[in-house]
Structures are given as C-alpha cells and as structure tokens.
C-alpha cells in the first residue's frame, strides 16, 4: 500500500537522522499520548459507523427477506396468474374453435340452404311467371268470355224479362182474346138468337108487311133485306180476320218462347263450365298464395340464419378482443414481474455492496485494533535507546496512518485534513437507533463515560503537527 511505502521512507529518514534533540523526544512522548486519544476518538467514530452500518445491514437483511418473500409471493402469483391465464386462454381458444367450427358448419349449412332456396326460388319464380302468364292469358280470355257472358246474361235477363212480360201480355191477351172470343161468341150467339128472333120477327113483320105491301112494294123490301144481310156478313168477316191475327200473334209468341228455351239450354252449360273454371282458378290462386307464404317463411328463416351468423361473428370478435385483453394483461404482469426482479437485483447488489463495505470496515477495524494493541502493548524498555523507541513509534504511527488512509480511501472514515477542519461537536452525534455494538465492545478503549469533544481539537492539531514534523 502507498502509506506503507511512505512509512519505509520515513523509517529510513529516521535511521539516517540518528541524533535528534531532546525537544523532539518530548514531543514524541506527547505525540504518543495525543495519538492514543486521537485513535481512541477514531475508533469510537469507526465503532459508531460500524453501529450505523450494522443497523443498515440489519435493515437491508430485513428488506431482503421482505423482498424475497414478496418475490416468492409475486412469483407464486405470477405462476397462478399465468396458469389461470393459460387455462382461460385455452378455454377461450377451445370456445373460439368451437364457435369457429359452429360458424363454419352454419355457413356451410346456410350456403347449402341458400343454394337450395335460390334454386327453389328461381324454379318457383319461373313456374310462377309461367303460371302468371298462363293465368293472365286465361284470365283475359275468361274476362272476355265473362264480359260477353255478362252481356249475354244481361241480354238473357232482358230477354227473360221481355219473355215474362210477353208471356204476361200474351196471357192477358189470351185471356182478353178468350174473354173477347167468349164475349164475341156469346154476343154472336146472342146476336144470332136476337137476329134470329129479330129476323123471325122481322121475317114475320116482313112477311106481314110483305103480305101487306107485297102487293105494293115488293122490290124495295127485298133490296133492304139484302143490304142488311151484307152488313152483317161484313161484320162477321171482320171478326174472323181479327181472330186470325190474334192466333198468329199467339203462334209467334210461342215460337219466341221455344227459341228462348233453346238459348237458355245452350247458355246454362257454358255458364256452368265458366263457373267451374273460375273455381279452379280460385284454387290455383290459393295454391300460389300458400306457396308465396311458404317462400316468405323460408325468406324469414334465411334472415334469421343471417342474424344468427352475425351474432356468431360478434361473439367471435368479442372473444378475440377478450383474448387480446388477456394477452395485454399477461404482458403487463410479466413487465411488472420483470421490474420487481430488477428491483430485487438492485437491492441484492446494494446488499452485497453494503456487505462488502461492512467486511472492509471490519477489516479496517481489525487492523486498527491490532495496531492499537501493538501500540498499547509496546512499552519502551529502559535499555532501549531513544532512536529505537522513536523508530518503533514511527512504525506504529505509519501503520495507524495506513489504516486510516485505507478507511479514508474506502470513504468510510475521515481523512486527516477533514479531522483538522471538522467542528468539535461533530463527534457528539450518535445513532438514533439501537445497534448490536457499542463503544468499548472491542475491549481496546474504555467505554465512553463523558464527551471527548473538548479534547478533539487539541488532539487533532497536535497529531497533525507531529505528523508534519516526521514527514
């Protein structure tokens, strides 16, 4: 170490300068006492630092245990979470596969049903179009026939009404004719009777008159009788002609009635056939209506299948989203675990660093204790020369300085210049916590019963001046 090299140089200089003055020997003796006090203060400071580092080491050990337990818990939780996420993911994947298979089956079934429905629909549309065209033409034909039939029906009704009116009129005329014939016959009979009577009377009167005036006016009476006979004959001829006309009208009405009956016999089968065709057309229309309803139900089924397919697609997207969320959660948990592991590694490194520093401090303390023991046990004998005593003290001082320089190099102890500039009350600070070690536990210095702050200033200055002189 560099302090040891300096110690060798100082020892060589002390050997070369064999004769020193008595004042220097007295200063050396005083330096020994001051060095003891300085080193005792240094040891107390190191013990206090050791207490703090021991307390910090205990705290770090407790933190390490807590962190190890937390790490175990986190790892266990991670394993549980990973296992749960794997199980959930497996279930979701199984469910997703089942849904995908169901979706594919539904799609295949839907495609097959759609193709069959489309073929059936096209066939039905073609049949419907053909039937529509056929029935449209038939309806047009039937409409024409129906129009003609309606016209014929109206004509028939008109003719029937006319027939009825003519029959009524004929009946009335017949009754009138019969009554008139009866009246005429009755009148004719009565007239004949009356005429007979009148003629008989007239004949009688005429005969009487004729007898009376036969002699006087025979030609005039004959002429008047002939005229009366001609007038009666003309009246009878008129009645006969009128009767013939009525008989002709009666025959014409009967012929019209027979013609109407023949026409009615012809139109009734045609009307019956048209009625049958109309009923058949109504049945076909009902069948087409049923087929349309069936097609509408099939279309509704297709719509429902499409809705089910859309719902399956929505469920599939929701499951994919949930799986993605689970993956993100798994990644977040893994990242948290990695951060926790990094924190644990950092704490472990800090703990190792503290342990290493603690070991170095213990080494420095052991070296200081050994040096102090040697310094305290090294009692100068009377036969030793002052040069040997001085050399031995210089060697002890070099060892102690080397120990202090090592502690200062580690950053765990004050350097000599720091001790010269530190305040007297700086060493009065003690740890606020309890520790495993207290001042005097090493057995090298007495336990602290009073404050040494009043002595540190002079001790530091005397040690520093002594070291400068030896240098």
Curated annotation (Swiss-Prot):
Function: Specifically required during spermatogenesis for flagellum morphogenesis and sperm motility.
BP-aspect Gene Ontology terms: sperm axoneme assembly
Ranges in coiled-coil conformation: 27-190, 225-369
Biased segments, Polar residues type: 451-471
InterPro entries named among the record's database cross-references: CFAP157 (IPR038844)
Compositional bias (Basic and acidic residues): 23-33
UniProt family annotation: Belongs to the CFAP157 family.
Molecular functions (GO terms): microtubule binding
Keyword Plastid: no
Keywords: Cell projection, Cilium, Coiled coil, Cytoplasm, Cytoskeleton, Differentiation, Spermatogenesis
Gene: cfap157
Chain residue ranges for the region called Disordered: 1-33, 447-471
A GO cellular component entry from the record: cytoplasm
Main subcellular location: cytoplasm
Protein name per UniProt: Cilia- and flagella-associated protein 157
Organism name: Danio rerio
Compartment(s) where it occurs, according to its Swiss-Prot or TrEMBL record: Cytoplasm, Cytoskeleton, Cilium basal body
PANTHER family, per database record: CILIA- AND FLAGELLA-ASSOCIATED PROTEIN 157
Keyword Amino-acid biosynthesis attributed: no
């Amino acid at each position: 170490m560099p302090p040891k090299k300096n110690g060798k140089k100082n020892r060589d200089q002390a050997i070369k300068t064999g004769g020193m003055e008595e004042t220097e020997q007295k200063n050396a003796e005083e330096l020994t006492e001051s060095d003891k006090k300085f080193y005792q203060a240094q040891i107390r400071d190191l013990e206090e630092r050791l207490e703090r580092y021991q307390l910090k080491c205990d705290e770090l050990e407790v933190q390490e245990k807590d962190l190890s337990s937390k790490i175990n818990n986190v790892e266990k939780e991670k394993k549980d979470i990973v296992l749960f996420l794997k199980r959930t993911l497996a279930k979701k994947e199984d469910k997703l596969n089942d849904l995908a298979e169901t979706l594919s089956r539904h799609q295949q079934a839907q495609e097959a049903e759609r193709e069959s429905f489309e073929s059936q629909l096209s066939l039905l549309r073609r049949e419907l179009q053909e039937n529509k065209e056929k029935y449209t033409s038939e309806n047009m034909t039937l409409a024409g026939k129906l129009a003609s039939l309606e016209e014929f029906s109206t004509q028939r009704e008109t003719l029937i009404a006319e027939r009825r009116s003519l029959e009524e009129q004929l009946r009335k005329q017949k009754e009138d004719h019969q009554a008139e014939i009866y009246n005429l016959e009755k009148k004719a009979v009565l007239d004949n009777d009356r005429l007979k009577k009148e003629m008989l009377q007239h004949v009688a009167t005429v005969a009487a008159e004729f007898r009376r005036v036969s002699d006087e006016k025979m030609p005039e009476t004959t002429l008047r009788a002939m005229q009366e006979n001609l007038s009666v004959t003309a009246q009878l001829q008129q009645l006969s002609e009128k009767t013939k006309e009525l008989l002709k009208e009666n025959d014409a009405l009967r012929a019209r009635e027979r013609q109407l009956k023949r026409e009615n016999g012809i139109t009734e089968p045609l009307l019956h056939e048209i009625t049958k065709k109309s009923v058949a057309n109504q049945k076909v229309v009902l069948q087409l209506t049923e087929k349309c309803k069936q097609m509408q139900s099939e279309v509704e089924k297709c719509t429902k299948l499409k809705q089910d397919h859309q719902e399956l697609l929505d469920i599939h997207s929701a499951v994919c989203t949930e799986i993605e969320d689970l993956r993100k959660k798994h990644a977040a948990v893994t990242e948290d675990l990695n951060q926790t592991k990094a924190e644990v590694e950092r704490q472990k490194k800090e703990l190792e660093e503290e342990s290493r520093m603690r070991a170095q401090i213990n080494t420095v303390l052991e070296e200081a204790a050994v040096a102090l023991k040697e310094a305290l046990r090294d009692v100068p004998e009377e036969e030793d020369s002052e040069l040997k005593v001085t050399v031995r003290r210089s060697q002890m001082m070099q060892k102690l300085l080397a120990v202090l320089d090592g502690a200062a190099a580690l950053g765990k102890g004050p350097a000599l210049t720091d001790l010269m500039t530190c305040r007297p009350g700086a060493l009065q600070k003690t740890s606020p916590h309890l520790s495993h070690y207290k001042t005097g536990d090493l057995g090298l210095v007495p336990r602290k019963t009073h404050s040494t702050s009043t002595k540190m200033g002079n001790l530091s200055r005397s040690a520093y001046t002594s070291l400068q002189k030896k240098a």
